[in-house]
């Protein structure tokens, strides 16, 4: 591995992303596939690109990602978090900008567990008065 490589771990819901960034031409590879192939949804692709567009490094860095667990939205959020951490490792002066956009904070929301006697986490069975 090259010495000019920057690493960041990102997490969201049940997804974990390992992000490696190095100086390049703007390629983003997710699980050995291009970003456009891996994510079918345009919104997921936008979420992944957000931190790079914010600091105007879309064409300056090559991003290589391995991501596990969760669904499309969770994985996209995890990759965004990982890219943000890699950018901060690259240049610490980017931290205030990324923090203001809300990319540095780990979104701690998790799925609430299903409770006994209920249909879902909070949905109760239908109540019949008579």
Swiss-Prot record:
Instruction: Please give the positions of the paired cysteines in each disulfide bond.
Output: none
Q: Does the keyword Cytoplasm apply?
A: no
Q: Which residues form the signal peptide?
A: none
> Any idea which GO molecular function terms this record carries?
RNA binding; structural constituent of ribosome
InterPro entries noted in UniProt: Ribosomal_Su5_D2-typ_SF, Ribosomal_uS9, Ribosomal_uS9_bac/plastid, Ribosomal_uS9_CS, Ribsml_uS5_D2-typ_fold_subgr
GO BP terms, alphabetized: translation
Q: Does the keyword NADP apply?
A: no
GO CC, one annotated term = cytosolic small ribosomal subunit
Please indicate which superkingdom the organism of origin belongs to.
Bacteria
Q: Which controlled-vocabulary keywords does the entry list?
A: Ribonucleoprotein, Ribosomal protein
A Pfam family hit: Ribosomal_S9
Q: Which family does it belong to?
A: Belongs to the universal ribosomal protein uS9 family.
Under which name does UniProt file this protein?
A: Small ribosomal subunit protein uS9
Organism annotation:
Shewanella amazonensis (strain ATCC BAA-1098 / SB2B)
């Amino acid at each position: 591995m090259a010495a000019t490589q920057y690493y960041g771990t990102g997490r969201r819901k049940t997804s974990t992303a390992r992000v490696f960034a190095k100086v390049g031409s703007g390629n983003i590879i997710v699980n050995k596939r291009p970003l456009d192939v891996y994510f079918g949804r345009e919104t997921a692709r936008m979420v992944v690109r957000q931190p790079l567009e914010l600091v105007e490094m879309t064409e300056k860095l090559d991003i290589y990602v391995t991501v596990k667990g969760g669904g499309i939205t969770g994985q996209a959020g995890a990759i965004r978090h990982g890219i943000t951490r890699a950018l901060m490792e690259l240049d610490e002066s980017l931290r205030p900008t990324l923090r203001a956009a809300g990319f540095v904070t780990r979104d701690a929301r998790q799925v609430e567990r299903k409770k006994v006697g209920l249909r879902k986490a909070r949905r109760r069975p239908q109540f019949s008065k008579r």
